[in-house]
Amino acid sequence: MSALVDQLVAQVIGLEVGLLSCQARLAAVTDDEALHDLRTTVRRLRSLLRPLRGLPGVEQLELAASSVGQLTTPLRDREVLAAYLHQHGYHEAASRRLRLQPEAYRQVAQSPELAHLLLILDAFPRFIRASEHQKLLKGLRPRIQKRLAKQWQKLDEALKDPDHDRHRLRLLIKRVRYAAEAYPELDKLPANAMSRLKKAQGALGDWHDCWQWLAQAEHQADLQPCVAVWHRTMAKAEGQADRVLDRLSADCF
């Protein structure tokens, strides 16, 4: 048990260091990957926490991480859209969006949401150690394994549903994949599962981008020239996603 707790504490401290680095990069607007790296780090934290629900401090930390995720989602979406627009020659539309980013980066760095997350995260290793001392972590390893297996079962059921919802499938795939990365020694997935999950997530991500951009185009006039292409790309992505999901289901379940 002590080894597992040591690993948890080490991961939490590493994630805290990563977040502090991202915060400094955002505050100084050093590069355009800082926001993405911040979100990736928060995602890794949430994946680490999900199987630990019920332990002291976990709920508060999950809520704080979720708040940072909600704060930064529209900013990251704008980044991704601007990159697409630049790539396809719509430079003016891209620039209009990118001009907003530097100030947005600074606001995220100074936000109460990020400050609150860092405050709770700094104290969390002490919560884990105190829980261990009070014998609250008995059975932690099988509990984590049981919750990881339950996530895998949920994905299996969703894949077998003929009326599956792509949004929910995308979320379930991300949860399973990131949990496996957080607990590689505890998550007993089939040998080729990670590569299949990554491909499925990518295919659903392409579909989701088009779906989201088409929704934005309804009230952003400068996106209208892209609408026809997005409809075609979305239809193609749906077919690709279905094929990849069928392969995931056949190979891994």
Residue ranges of model-derived segments:
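Function-determining surface determinants
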Residues: 1-253
